[in-house]
Amino acid sequence: MTQAHTATTVTTVSVDSLRQSARSHALPDDAAWRVDDVAALFALPFNDLLFRAQQVHREHFDANTVQLSTLLSIKTGGCEEDCGYCPQSAHHDAGVKAEKLMALDEVLDAARAAKANGATRFCMGAAWRSPKDRHLEPVMDMVREVKAMGLETCVTLGMLKAEQAQQLKEAGLDYYNHNLDTSPEFYGKIITTRTYQDRLDTIGHVRDAGINVCCGGIVGMGEAREARAGLIAQLANMDPYPESVPINNLVQVEGTPLAGTEALDPFEFVRTIAVARITMPRAMVRLSAGREAMDEALQALCFMAGANSIFYGEKLLTTGNPQADRDRALLARLDIRAEGYAG
């Protein structure tokens, strides 16, 4: 998103006020979150932070309902970018082979299966730096057909030009995913082939086209808490902030530069979910990659912290995700309903 798309009005809020009463849950919508303000939320006692996040969550959502989303890799591997976490990068030897774009019928079969299993949102990801115009038409066909099934549609295709965003809007796309990944200061340690401003520009094109924005990041890449606070501040200060905020916990894949990175403390991941909920109270906060390594108690804490969507199914692009039966069993034990699912 360009500077024109970013909130610039700053309301002064003291760190002390952020620590005070749990009644003052979040800043007014016209305020901007300073990194120090977000860091102060991270530093709250764990129980206080979760209590505040749960209060904010209940003001805007049914705390016992989650949305189930399914993510399908429609074009895997061979990406020109050098993202240090990604096994689909052509720069890394992670054993992921480049594949062609999936056929429409295959995608629709996957979408039907996702809907039958309770998903209300179907996301399609392609490992491109940016789509060529000739690639966009088949993707738009996928969007039209999946939307006709009654599913929300989301795609993530890399960087977009303004006219490409407009074409996707005309095809009926509901959401476009383009993550910031981390804070501006830490970004260069993870990616060198695409600038932070490139990402902001694509988000700006998506917003200008009238498509809902899905934008979040990845934690556990060796960053300090300040970088996590910086990421949340960037997201929360978008005008408006994203409708969907996926929070990913790094999945370490052999052959990628980030393999062997010290794992993030699980409670710090929960704190990140809670801070995202407080700073972006009306967003769908999506518990995304990394759930395969989380036990049920940790996932339950994430729901308490304000996560209200999960990616559902056996694969999340090229890494593991808890199987659907396990997900349904966990939600049943927690008395959490899947949005729009009566199965």
Swiss-Prot record:
Q: Which residues bind [2Fe-2S] cluster?
A: 123, 154, 214, 286
- Keyword flag 4Fe-4S: yes
Group of enzyme by EC: transferase
Give the source's domain of life in one word: Bacteria
List the Pfam families hit by this protein, alphabetically: BATS, Radical_SAM
Enzymatic reactions:
(4R,5S)-dethiobiotin + (sulfur carrier)-SH + 2 reduced [2Fe-2S]-[ferredoxin] + 2 S-adenosyl-L-methionine = (sulfur carrier)-H + biotin + 2 5'-deoxyadenosine + 2 L-methionine + 2 oxidized [2Fe-2S]-[ferredoxin]
> Can you tell me where the transmembrane regions are?
none
A biological process term (GO) from this entry: biotin biosynthetic process
The enzyme's E.C. designation: 2.8.1.6
| Example GO molecular function | biotin synthase activity
Asked whether the keyword Iron is assigned, the reply is yes
What keywords are assigned to this protein? 2Fe-2S, 4Fe-4S, Biotin biosynthesis, Iron, Iron-sulfur, Metal-binding, S-adenosyl-L-methionine, Transferase
Q: How is the cofactor bound?
A: Binds 1 [4Fe-4S] cluster. The cluster is coordinated with 3 cysteines and an exchangeable S-adenosyl-L-methionine. Binds 1 [2Fe-2S] cluster. The cluster is coordinated with 3 cysteines and 1 arginine.
Q: In which pathway does it act?
A: Cofactor biosynthesis; biotin biosynthesis; biotin from 7,8-diaminononanoate: step 2/2
Family membership, please give it.
Belongs to the radical SAM superfamily. Biotin synthase family.
Subunit organization = Homodimer.
Q: Which HAMAP family match?
A: BioB
Protein name as it appears in the record: Biotin synthase
